[in-house]
Amino acid sequence: MAQFYSAKRRTTTRQIITVSVNDLDSFGQGVARHNGKTLFIPGLLPQENAEVTVTEDKKQYARAKVVRRLSDSPERETPRCPHFGVCGGCQQQHASVDLQQRSKSAALARLMKHEVSEVIADVPWGYRRRARLSLNYLPKTQQLQMGFRKAGSSDIVDVKQCPILVPQLEALLPKVRACLGSLQAMRHLGHVELVQATSGTLMILRHTAPLSSADREKLERFSHSEGLDLYLAPDSEILETVSGEMPWYDSNGLRLTFSPRDFIQVNAGVNQKMVARALEWLEVEPEDRVLDLFCGMGNFTLPLATQAASVVGVEGVPALVEKGQQNARLNCLQNVTFYHENLEEDVTKQPWAKNGFDKVLLDPARAGAAGVMQQIIKLEPIRIVYVSCNPATLARDSEALLKAGYTIARLAMLDMFPHTGHLESMVLFSRVK
């Protein structure tokens, strides 16, 4: 008869080690060395010593957490947000803005094997003009939670303030919480989005069950008292306008309308500077034919059209193409053509690919633009500006251009999301004559 024994669980005592941090990675983690291995330690900065314990041990690197900080970096800051360290939104409020920008620029330079020529930045606080706050009803307390997810968790941090939001949105937080917490339907609320446009403030409420007439009336009164445009979203497809008209924002001398669910850059200040610098780098001439790939609703396309002879924008989301066409008409731009095409498919047979272009701009999503790089090379543009939200795919796509005889003329770090681990960038490629 076979006998089975439970294996004894191994108990290990986590050893406390003392480390000196010599670098900060782009995600805001302190970097140290111990026994020949790289350690990543959240919460520590260069020039700091600390006692830490290893939480994850891999072959090439390890992760650790702080037990006790023994010294402070001169670039350590007191976080402005009381939720910092618990809320998953920000990772670097404890570091000076200058250190954040230097560490991100250094990471970008290492990846691209090229010096970062400039940092395009704006105000480091009160910059975010869009936020989605999760909502969760707690039956025990009969209270409504409203906030962001905890770091590495689906739990919600009940947010009372958020200093990276534009002041208009941060001031609204307690009022929105009070309003939503008084609804009969607070058990059936998914999330609320707040957007600050030039035209005013938008509030989009996702609800998972029909709202009573009393709740609708209460929300409408709230929107009027706070001067909000209110939209109700019973599902991911339907959007009902309760109050307000088509929102819009100013961008580089143009007025752009958008739907509340459309993607717009959350940092208006950096977006304005980024668009202006892209046009400057491309050196757009009145006779130029310019191609804008992954163009969205025309963030770059329409400003380009104010300077070039003709501009073609290509985008995979039909609603954004329609919005781009509408905004071209509103701004009296008749030299723009938008195409709805999937740029992840074979682009050689797409109508835009038959045209000739002098200059190209592309602003792909995180997956990058591998599918269009060879077509761009065939077009032989003089200058190419690549705007990236993922340095890894940027480095990959850049290889194709470098092999084809292009060189990196300028490389900028875009500080689009201060105090977070997000790294955005923009590169100018020039064709070698």
UniProtKB/Swiss-Prot annotation:
Example GO BP: rRNA base methylation
Domain TRAM: 10-68
Keywords: 4Fe-4S, Iron, Iron-sulfur, Metal-binding, Methyltransferase, rRNA processing, S-adenosyl-L-methionine, Transferase
Catalytic-site annotation from UniProt: C389 (nucleophile)
Keyword Ligase assigned: no
Enzyme Commission number, as recorded: 2.1.1.190
Pfam hit, one: tRNA_U5-meth_tr
Recorded superkingdom: Bacteria
One Gene Ontology molecular-function label: iron ion binding
Enzyme class: transferase
Reactions catalysed, as given in the entry: uridine(1939) in 23S rRNA + S-adenosyl-L-methionine = 5-methyluridine(1939) in 23S rRNA + S-adenosyl-L-homocysteine + H(+)
Binding positions for [4Fe-4S] cluster per the UniProt entry: C81, C87, C90, C162
Coiled-coil portions: none
Residue positions binding S-adenosyl-L-methionine: Q265, F294, N299, E315, N342, D363
Entry-linked CDD domains: AdoMet_MTases
Function: Catalyzes the formation of 5-methyl-uridine at position 1939 (m5U1939) in 23S rRNA.
Family: Belongs to the class I-like SAM-binding methyltransferase superfamily. RNA M5U methyltransferase family. RlmD subfamily.
HAMAP family recorded: 23SrRNA_methyltr_RlmD (MF_01010)
Name of this protein: 23S rRNA (uracil(1939)-C(5))-methyltransferase RlmD
Organism: Escherichia coli O157:H7
Top-level taxonomy: Bacteria, Pseudomonadati, Pseudomonadota, Gammaproteobacteria, Enterobacterales
